[in-house]
Amino acid sequence: MSSANLSIKENGAMVVFGASGDLSKKKTFPALFSLFSEGRLPKDIRIVGYARSKIEHEDFLDRITQNIKIDEEDSQAKEKLEEFKKRCSYYRGSYDKPEDFEGLNSHLCEREGDRSTHNRIFYLALPPDVFVSVATNLKKKCVPEKGIARLVIEKPFGVDLKSAQELQSQLAPLFDEKEIYRIDHYLGKEMVQNLVHLRFCNPVISHLWDKNSISSVQITFKEPIGTEGRGGYFDSSTIVRDIVQNHLVQILTLLTMETPTTFSADDLRDEKVKVLRRTRLGDLKDIVLGQYVKSKDGKKPGYLDDETVPKGSRCPTYSAIPCFIDTERWRGVPFLLKAGKAMDIGKVEIRVQFKAAANGLFKDAYHNELVIRVQPDEAIYFKMNIKQPGLSEAPLLTDLDLTYSRRFKNMKLHEAYEALFLDAFAGDQSRFARIDELECAWSLVDPLLKYMEEEKPVPEPYEYGSDGPECLYSFLKKFGYIYDSPDYYDYPVMSVPSDH
């Protein structure tokens, strides 16, 4: 039975592969509980955690609920949590033995009970090297004869264009493209979802959204922690694979795509693919690659101090990458993708700087900027000039500030995984990457990955807890960004998140 565009409203089950991992306890199960408590999941939902670790049932329940926060005085919330735990179970198995998947299918059937159809979502929070063996065994042993089957796959999908294509060639005979949901959790974040509405619901913004009005665009990811024991994994991934190729490129496409015919999943992704195919890197020698060293006070170690990192590694933990889009709308506008670990603060934001007024009447006016803060403290603010209050005629820089926590005090903003899991049950693929979209993203960064592998450039050092390499200022200046915020200007208040 085809699963295209069909919503799973009953007879639903979800298998969480990698259920013993940190992502499972920190994000996956809290998101599923939130949806369950709001009645957004199928009313008869069954959730099975699957991993290789030996975990007793009660220990598993304790593990998956330790990050779920409820009001202990709220009896209804406590009842919901207990009911949720009854819907969850654990099954231990390997990722390559058919008999373990046969056992999983029996476990699912037992949990599901007497159903006329079996609608199953298989969520793979696993290393890419086991995707194919898991998908193969699922197809043979666990895909129902009557019902819907969907494969939800966590990033990374490959490590470059070639590996992504090889992986897809092995998955394609097993699951149709309409059954594969490739997750980039940034597409579930509130402010990333909001980009489409911001651009296409507001004519005042739409009319300014091109090379005639915009001088530069920055997409910035800053994380305040380093690799902290994950250096072995990160060293093979690099900041380019870990953050730029997926999160930042996805944001770039939503910022720059043309108006889709409709907001159906394929129409939306068609436009993203079109703009990606016209996107290219700037000169490789203009790219800033950095690696953090110990903090100024010596309390935080450098990247090479991590025992899991290979000695002498030149893996970049920071990158600033210029991109250009060869379309009539965007030709000549630099898009600067900046990402780094062990930074001064944690934030993800989009900064659109507009060109100076052409009339020349106010030579001391400041540049307008539209800033979209993805996290923390979701916000949109527009930096603008007004007359300085009082008798002066001098321009004063201020902003129109839409900070969500102040404007929408009684409205819950759902976590990214909540939105994405809900879409997976609904059969909506618009916030999941299609294979040609992923291929374009890898094609974009592949020249940089090849340059890093072959030339092994020495990364610029920057202190743990700093704003990045010292050459960053000259990089931004070269690509037209103008620092002109006066000392008196106070940026909207922001807190620092612990993760991304």
Swiss-Prot record:
Q: What Pfam families would the database entry show?
A: G6PD_C, G6PD_N
Q: In which pathway does it act?
A: Carbohydrate degradation; pentose phosphate pathway; D-ribulose 5-phosphate from D-glucose 6-phosphate (oxidative stage): step 1/3
In alphabetical order, the GO MF annotations are: glucose-6-phosphate dehydrogenase activity; NADP binding
Location comes to:
Cytoplasm, Cytosol
Q: Sorted alphabetically, which PROSITE patterns does this protein's record hold?
A: G6P_DEHYDROGENASE (PS00069)
Reactions catalysed? D-glucose 6-phosphate + NADP(+) = 6-phospho-D-glucono-1,5-lactone + NADPH + H(+)
Q: Where does NADP(+) 2 bind?
A: K338, K347, R351, R373, Y381, F382, K383, D401, L402, T403, Y483
Q: Where does D-glucose 6-phosphate bind?
A: K155, H185, Y186, L187, G188, K189, E223, D242, K341, Q375
Residues at which NADP(+) 1 binds? G18, A19, S20, G21, D22, L23, S24, K25, R52, K155
Q: Which UniProt keywords apply?
A: Carbohydrate metabolism, Cytoplasm, Glucose metabolism, NADP, Oxidoreductase
KW Signal (keyword) present: no
Q: Which GO terms describe its biological process?
A: glucose metabolic process; pentose-phosphate shunt, oxidative branch
Which enzyme type, at the first EC level?
A: oxidoreductase
Top-rank taxon of the source lineage equals: Eukaryota
* One of the record's GO cellular component terms: cytosol
Per the entry, what this protein does is: Catalyzes the rate-limiting step of the oxidative pentose-phosphate pathway, which represents a route for the dissimilation of carbohydrates besides glycolysis. The main function of this enzyme is to provide reducing power (NADPH) and pentose phosphates for fatty acid and nucleic acid synthesis.
Protein name per UniProt: Glucose-6-phosphate 1-dehydrogenase
Q: Species lineage, top-down?
A: Eukaryota, Fungi, Dikarya, Ascomycota, Taphrinomycotina
